[in-house]
C-alpha cells in the first residue's frame, strides 16, 4: 500500500511517500502554503499522481497529549483535505517529536518539514506493518 504522509504547517507542508510495499518512507518536496485553496489542490494532485491509497496527516498534540491551537488548525485542514481527496482515506496520527528527530538527521537534501513527514510515515508504517502485509 502506498501511503502519503503530511507534516502540515500554515507556511509549508512536509511530504513523504512510501514505496508500494509500505516498507520505505521517502521525503519528497514540500508544498508551500498548504492552507490556501491552491495549496490544497497541490496536495490532492500529489496524492493522485503518486497513486496513494491512504494519507496520514501528522497531529501536533501538546506534550501531555492535549489539543493546542495548532492541533485544531490541523484537524480543520485535514477535514478540508478529506473532502478534496475522497475516496482516499485521510487519517490523523500523533506527530510528537518528529520534527526534533528530523532536525537531528542532518540531511540537507530535503526540507526539515519533509524529513519530519518521513519520520511520521516510518512510525505509522511500523505500527501498521501487519495490516499492510
Residue spans for each PLM region:
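Phosphate- and other anionic-substrate recognition elements at nucleic-acid/protein interfaces
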Residues: 1-6, 10-133
